[in-house]
Each structure stands twice: as C-alpha cells, then as structure tokens.
C-alpha cells in the first residue's frame, strides 16, 4: 500500500519539492514567488493571483508617481477609451470602478434600492446583494442544482414586476461552475427583456472552453445586460482596487451617477500596462492550470469529489465541516476558504503558487491520512 510519503515523492514530482531544501526550487518559481510578510500563513482563501504585480506593471507604477498630484479623471477616461477599443464598445459604455466590487454595489444601489428585487443563485459572490439589502432591496435566492450550477430555468420563472436585477457570477464563485454557452446566451436574451441581467465575469479569463461568449456581446446588441470585469484576478492587482462595468450608454449613465470611489492614478496606469503585458497574462494562466492539476491529483487520491473548475480556485466535498477543517489547516500554516452555506462540508481552495499548493497538499495529507 502506498504511504503518504511515497505518494508525495511520486505524484507530479511535488514530493521532491516538499522534501528538498528551497535552494532547488526552479529558477522561474523562485524569481516569481515573492513571500508576503504581512500574512504569516499561506493564503489560499481569497482567489488572488500570487504572482502579481508583473514587473512591467511595477515599473509603470514607479514611473507614474509624478502624476500623483493630479486628479484621476483624465487618466480614467484614457483607460476607458483603451477598454472600449479592446471590447468593441463606445467609451460611454465603460465605467471605471474601485475594483469590480464597487461596480456590483453601485449597480444594486442604482436599480434595486427602496424595495426592488434581485434574483440570485446561492451560493455566489455576495457583494451586490449584501450592499443592496442595506438600502432596502429584497433578495430572491435560487439554490444551485445538484451539479452546483445555476438553475436558470427557476431563476427566470421567478422574475416578476418587482424584479430589477438578475445576478449571475459566471464562472461562479465559490463553485467554479460555468453556464453552458447556449443556455447563457438564451437566458440573457430572454431575461433581459424583463429585468436587467448582471453578468459578473471576474473569472472569465480562466475559461478554457473554446469560443465561450462574454455577455459583452449582449451589451453590443443593446440588451439590458451589465458586465463587470476586474484587474484583481489574472492580472494580479487585487490590492490596487480597479475594475470596470460595461453597459449600453443609457444604463451606464444611471450607474455613473452613483460612483463613490475614484480609482487613483497609480491603479489606472497599472491597469493600462497590465492590458499590454500578454507574457504575464499567459504565465499566470499556465501556472493556474498547473496548480489545479496538482490539487485535482490530491483530491482524487483522497477520494474527495470536486467541481471541475473554470476559475483560479476549486470547490470540493471535504467530508468534514469546513468550520473544523479551516482551523485545522490554519494550524498547518494554510488559510483556506470560509464557509459557504448551505455547503458546510465543502471547501473552496484558491490556486496559489506551486510552492504554496504543495504546502496545502502536505497539510491535507497529514489531516486526512493521520
């Protein structure tokens, strides 16, 4: 019977990494892994890109300090023009926000406050709903199906005269599921005639399904659809807080009135550079794929069921209460995802660097095979 140590030695070559001194880590991994001294534990809990900021973005930020005395309006307008060209829309359709979270919140505030309804799957990313509730919105929760994917048929059935927004996070956080392309297009086409459909595409860059559509195409057709994008994930800029919304101009104009936080000049300039740094973009995607393979290998070894992920995290059936597994892993030096009701025996783990993933694997084996 294969022991834990044997498995570590043989699986994907990671055993050698765990059992060897740090000096033999690959040159690529050493040069791109920068330990964050602020957090004494490995953080696989927030779906961040641990390889960012790219060197090009860091240099752009350094050269942009001279502009720190200026208000960011013109800089943001220039970024909006760059994004409009990238996505094939007008600059009036772009709203620069302080991270995509601000975009979600101000959309909920704009359209659903004071008694409006938001229809949303559950579990999902909660920023829009929790904020809108504070301003008098009601939330109509639709549980995900057995496959952890959205039940779009049920969501559409629940649309009523009081429904103002339908929220989709696609791929979904925390489940990592992806709505089938045709089903997504058909749903947005139909539902957007009755209410505004909001498509959160924070993890869109990680999708590997060929020709998978962004709902920006629905915006271009003039549908009542809003799309959110972020620089926090594949671009590795979570700490800089910059994202954007895309909507037809008349919808964008309503949202723009409620923007609270201006993105600062350094974040805007960093975003401009990130859009041009394809080498780092591809590097991040490649590292994410490799990290997911290692985690899948572990979960298969432990006979733990998981959802095939289209993101930079994996949602798996832990067979333990996450409120117990979380502290146990933290004691091993690894922080994993929080509870996502009602799935208290499921766990979301982010893909960190390969070195971080190997420490996660080591901790999991110690817990599950002790």
Predicted regions: what they are:
Residues 152-159, 174-197, 201-232:
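Active-site pre-lysine segment of PLP-dependent enzymes
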Residues 144, 289, 301-332, 351:
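Conserved PLP-binding catalytic core of the aspartate aminotransferase-like
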Residues 328-332, 340-370:
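PLP-dependent enzyme catalytic core of the Aspartate aminotransferase-like
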Residues 78-117, 131:
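Phosphate-binding glycine-rich loop
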Residues 1-15:
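N-terminal secretory signal peptides and thylakoid transit peptides that target proteins
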Residues 14-70, 85:
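N-terminal "arm"/small-domain region of PLP-dependent enzymes with the aminotransferase-like
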Residues 110-168:
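PLP-dependent aminotransferase-like
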Residues 224-300, 304-307:
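PLP-dependent aminotransferase class I/II
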């Amino acid at each position: 019977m294969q022991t834990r140590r044997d498995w570590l030695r043989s699986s994907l070559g990671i055993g050698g990494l765990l059992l060897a001194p740090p000096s033999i880590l690959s040159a690529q991994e050493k040069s791109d892994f920068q330990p964050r001294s602020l957090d004494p534990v490995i953080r696989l809990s927030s779906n961040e890109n641990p390889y960012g900021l790219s060197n090009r973005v860091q240099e752009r930020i350094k050269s942009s300090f001279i502009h720190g005395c200026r208000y960011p309006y013109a800089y943001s307008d220039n970024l909006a023009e760059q994004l409009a060209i990238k996505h094939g829309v007008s600059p009036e359709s772009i709203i620069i926000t302080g991270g995509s979270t601000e975009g979600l919140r101000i959309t909920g505030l704009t359209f659903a406050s004071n008694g409006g309804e938001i229809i949303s799957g559950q579990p999902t990313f909660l920023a829009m709903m929790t904020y809108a509730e504070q301003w008098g919105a009601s939330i109509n929760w639709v549980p995900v199906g057995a496959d952890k994917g959205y039940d779009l048929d049920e969501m559409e059935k629940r649309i009523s005269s009081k429904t103002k927004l339908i929220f989709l996070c696609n791929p979904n956080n925390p489940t990592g599921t992806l709505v089938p392309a045709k089903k997504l297009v058909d749903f947005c086409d139909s539902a957007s005639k009755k209410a505004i459909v909001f498509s959160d595409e924070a993890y869109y860059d990680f999708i590997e399904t060929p020709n998978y559509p962004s709902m920006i195409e629905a915006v271009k057709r003039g549908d009542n659809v809003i799309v959110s994008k972020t620089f926090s994930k594949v671009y590795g800029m979570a700490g800089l807080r910059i994202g954007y919304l895309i909507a037809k101009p008349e919808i964008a104009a309503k949202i723009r009135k409620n923007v609270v936080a201006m993105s600062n000049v350094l974040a805007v300039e960093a975003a401009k550079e990130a859009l041009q740094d394809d080498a780092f973009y591809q590097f991040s995607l490649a590292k994410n794929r490799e990290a997911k393979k290692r985690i899948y290998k572990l979960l298969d070894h432990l006979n733990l069921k998981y959802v095939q992920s289209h993101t930079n995290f994996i949602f798996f059936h832990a067979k333990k209460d996450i409120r117990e597994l979380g502290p146990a892993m933290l004691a091993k030096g690894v922080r994993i995802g929080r509870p996502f009701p009602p799935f208290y025996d499921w766990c979301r783990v982010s893909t960190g660097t390969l070195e971080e993933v190997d420490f996660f694997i080591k901790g999991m084996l110690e817990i599950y095979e002790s």
